[in-house]
């Protein structure tokens, strides 16, 4: 593996670029959600979320291959094998085109039947729901074909392009939010049409960039049986993991609709908007880190790989904790400040989904390491099998009369079971030390979280809800979290590194 310091700098640079993108996207996304919710109303907002969720369930067929495409492209770059890259890219596009056709067929038969026969949608809005369904299918197919292009950008670590195109997408969605307010037709249908149009524009933006900058990203129809066998072999087992994640997220959304109706789907949809905005911090960091984990494995540098896994897990959690704690202690006030309409159940949904996101965050580097090995059969059978339990358990509990938030509580519990399974399996696959992981990551983040959370949580009971309370509690949460991370969460070398960086920044400011 090349100089670790150089690789770390690349990770830092790419993370910084993605953070600049993220801050803009987060602000735009949250404001867009407010405008869209108020323009559509709670019921239509919930309908759009759950109908889109039906289409998203078909990603079970594509998600596994998407991971395979990313892994194969990144792995070949790590080995420096340029000759094989175009074969992989062209094969990937061919596969995605075929899958798009299969998914459209399934959606127009099984999906359409489920929407019209089983879904809990008011009769008066069923016509609009069907239009949303059609445009959601088209949008999904377009995004599916974009996967090989996105994978190439990330594998080449060209995060500036990824950032700029994502910003273009966010601006498009913000424009849509304002346009639906003055819609000349049914607002829900108009919204679905415009979202599809944005997907088409972004698809061409990714394709144009890749063709200009990466020689392998020129599509030729290739039918290499050996390569396709390798990719499908990898994807076949990864299918279990992809299916379990889709069934957990979108299946849970559909189950909530069956028992609780579209207004609760709206509450869950808002919670996931908050989660997506906050989770962008970790997503951006892992997008920059993932190629280095895969490339270090391909180059045989397992020591550097382990360092990345441990540090990546802790940093992922700390980023989420720093953002989530102020929201967890001020959820009701933030939602009222952000939205004019706050659907019932939204507060608890938001709090639970943030806890779930933190629970999942420490597994991201482990998942990347597993994918890097290519030996995923046992992993996917066990971990994917555990995740698949989300849907039947949630269905059973809702049928027994439990509150809708139980779906997220089930997901949190199973997430912890999956973490344990990942560690046991990866000990055999890559030799990861469970004791080191528990000591350096798991127990570390638990202690940091408890110490950081106690002062702001206690303070919430002694200050009346207001902007002053929001400001005080948020500042207190930030100070406690940063202090806990620095003094407890960081080791000596990491504290020294932080001190050096702060001294460097101070010196530059003083010279000016």
Describe the residue ranges of each PLM region.
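Interhelical loop/hinge segments that connect adjacent transmembrane helices in multipass membrane
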Residues: 1-11, 188-194, 206-249, 292, ...
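Membrane-proximal transmembrane or re-entrant/amphipathic helices at the cytosolic face
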Residues: 1-2, 427-438, 456-512
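Signature of the first transmembrane helix
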Residues: 9-75, 104-108, 139, 173-174, ...
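Transmembrane helical elements of multi-pass membrane transporters/channels
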Residues: 13-30, 194-211, 225-295, 314-316, ...
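Interfacial/gating helices of multi-pass transporter permease domains
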Residues: 36-59, 88, 188-193, 227-234, ...
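Membrane-interface helix-loop junctions in multi-pass transport and translocation proteins
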Residues: 37-39, 43-44, 157-160, 171-204, ...
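Helix-loop junctions and terminal segments of transmembrane helices
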Residues: 63-79, 155, 214-215, 271, ...
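Membrane-interface junctions at transmembrane-helix termini in multi-pass inner-membrane proteins
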Residues: 138-168, 178, 189, 354-386, ...
